[in-house]
Regions:
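Mid-chain, well-packed structural core segment of small domains
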Residues: 74-96
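Long, amphipathic alpha-helical surface segments
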Residues: 1-28, 35-70, 90-141
């Protein structure tokens, strides 16, 4: 099982694209479609490289999520990769969300837990609310 083009497209929409480095809502230097590793302010990239970085980043996160051994469908894998792509694998691994999934909690409980993760830099962000809604929906597809 692999992440889908649905996820790639959704990440492109959710992350937005910048061909020039900028600081994200949490103050982290970011470029392309949410790429942060090794980014310095002033960096610039091409659209083609932005897409390649996204695909490589998704592949890395996918391997980490698969190691948790909880995703049973493509929808679950897409949702959890999106979550970990945004927040980091450590936050997913240590989260109540993962605990709920592992114990087979109800759709409502899992959906509500996704929706708790909507803050960056101490601020509630509409973009994160939209993202968590998509992840919760995709998880159950």
């Amino acid at each position: 099982m692999k992440t889908t083009e649905i996820l790639i497209h959704q990440l492109m929409v959710m992350e937005g694209r910048s061909l020039e480095a900028y600081k994200d809502a949490a103050g982290v230097p970011t470029i392309g479609y949410g790429h942060t590793k090794g980014v310095r302010m002033g960096d610039r990239i091409s659209e083609r490289w932005a897409v390649e970085l996204l695909k490589m980043d998704v592949q890395d996160v996918e391997l980490q999520v698969k190691a948790l051994d909880v995703a049973r469908t493509e929808g679950q894998l897409d949702a959890l990769v999106s979550f970990a792509f945004n927040l980091g694998i450590t936050r997913l691994r240590d989260s109540d969300l993962l605990k709920l999934i592992r114990k087979g909690a109800s759709k409502n409980a899992i959906t509500q837990e996704f929706k708790r993760w909507v803050y960056a830099g101490g601020k509630k962000l509409r973009g994160l609310e939209t993202r968590r809604e998509w992840e919760a929906k995709r998880f159950f597809e």
